[in-house]
From Swiss-Prot:
This is Ribosomal RNA small subunit methyltransferase G. It is found in: Cytoplasm. Belongs to the methyltransferase superfamily. RNA methyltransferase RsmG family. Residues 1-21, 230-254 are annotated as: Disordered. Its EC number is 2.1.1.-. Its main location: cytoplasm. One of its GO terms (cellular component) is cytosol. S-adenosyl-L-methionine binds at residues 90, 95, 142-143, 157. HAMAP family: 16SrRNA_methyltr_G. It comes from Kineococcus radiotolerans (strain ATCC BAA-149 / DSM 14245 / SRS30216). The gene is rsmG. It is an enzyme of class 2 (transferase). Keywords: Cytoplasm, Methyltransferase, rRNA processing, S-adenosyl-L-methionine, Transferase. Specifically methylates the N7 position of guanine in position 518 of 16S rRNA.
Amino acid sequence: MPEGDGVPRETPSPSVVPESPVEVPVEAVARVFGDRADRAATYRELLATAGVERGLIGPREVPRLWDRHLLNCAYLGEVIDQGSSVIDLGSGAGLPGIPLALARPDLQIRLVEPLERRYTFLREAITELGLRDQVAVARGRAEDVRGEFSASVVTARAVAPLKTLYGWALPLVVTGGHLVAIKGRSASDEIAAAGETLRQMGVTAAPEVLSVGPDDGTGTTVVRVARGHGPLRAATAPAPPGAAKRRPGKGNRR
């Protein structure tokens, strides 16, 4: 499934990791992750090794894990209130949930992922990173955890176009909370295409397109949607996460 931020989340059974030198953006890492910068470096290494070996991260992504993945995801913290509960829907290899947890120790985060091999990686990663008191992992699709879990913020990256994502994510958001989705240049087009879905669901607030992180072109574009305080209505139901055919970068292999 083509996704707005253009980020490949998986690749078929990679066997070679590029040996290109990796430039660490030391100042940005220190600023964003603070005294957890060493844990962020450990997570980056997990993605570059086990993440690639298990097909969760494409080998060509390794040289840009810091900028395009860890920092890119951690910047979401700029639009999330202090002490919020967060569900990271379709977490994959932990993006954006794990970088967000590392950058924001005040958040309580639940990673929701339907596929077993990704779920296993996530459990191993949060243990390795010492995040078990802050981050939990649930295996399932959005409709599997609906009614069991909810949060003040639901995050998503490279999961689905907004037209589909609204129906999966907004029912997991508590009244007054937000959906925060990482999107790229397609954000405005996706918002326009999904307008009728929001109307069907009874959401009246207009989605916001926000830029977080540096203003030098390396920041992150996000779409933030307020859940509101009224009841949600069912929109035309899309197929659940995991049932939709994913693009080659996000296969459904176990």
